[in-house]
Amino acid sequence: MIRKYNLYQIDSFTKEKFTGNPAGVITNADGLTDYEMQKIARELNNSETAFIFSSKDERYDAWVRFFTPTSEVPICGHATIAAHYARAIENNLETSRVYHKTGAGILPVDVIKENDDYKIIMTQGKIEFGSVIDGEKKEKLLRALNIEKSDLLENYKIQIVSTGHSKVMIGIKSLKTLNKLQPNYDVLSKLSKIIKCNGYYVFAVTSEDSDILIHGRMFAPAIGINEDPVTGNANGPLGAYLVHHKLACYDNSIFKFKAKQGEAIGRQGIIEVEVRVDKEEPVEVKISGNAVVVFKSELVLN
């Protein structure tokens, strides 16, 4: 039997094609097997591809699964933006809140219609603070990134943080150093197995752009992504990290900032992050961004 699927290529965290972070999206994924989804993700070769399935439960509107070229992951920020952008276009949605089932739980997504286009706001998963990377593991990490201890920001612990898909937070002093990073991907992959975390988010806090607080780069070679252009599940946890370690300035229990990523690889995009704070601790993280359709096609399978 011939099966036809709606296939999109969408750039997230940008309004300009060929920038931001590209994601594949299949909006009518019912009937696809795990094997087929993995093959499709490998063929498209984006850092993630999102597959939208019909809801089978009144608690959520859609079930979304995310695959890198090599494996399934619980959730993905830019592919969530892409998936719900495509879904909003197909269904001509008005401003609304929808819920999607993911590997990180059932989470809300806000679809904001403005000027005949959409902005997507993703509420991320449970905030979790993991291990601090120190000692021999820290030495291995610095060697893998080809940076020195003197490059690190003081009082910024190297720590695993998650809002659904964990990342190692690594603060460095210089934007110039950030843009020149040339990691040893093989060593990073091996270290991931030891620390049980696949992504490394190296960031600089800068005042060079008055509108941008964070510039970053994210490496995840252990799951087939040497460098991810713009990463929702790195900047979201970073917001929680900055609040938790009292490195953030905010008013009225809301910490907001913008992060720019992808500059070093020619795919820059901007993420807006909002952290709700209660009793000086982060309790909820949202990320938001724009998107643009690069192409729409039809995938035909027998």
Curated annotation (Swiss-Prot):
UniProt-recorded Gene Ontology molecular function terms: isomerase activity
Active site, per annotation: 48
GO annotations of cellular component type: cytoplasm
One GO BP: biosynthetic process
Key words, A-Z: Isomerase
EC number of this enzyme: 5.1.-.-
Keyword Signal attributed: no
Keyword Isomerase: yes
Family, per entry: Belongs to the PhzF family.
NCBIfam families: PhzF_family, PRK10281.1
Protein name: Uncharacterized isomerase CA_C3446
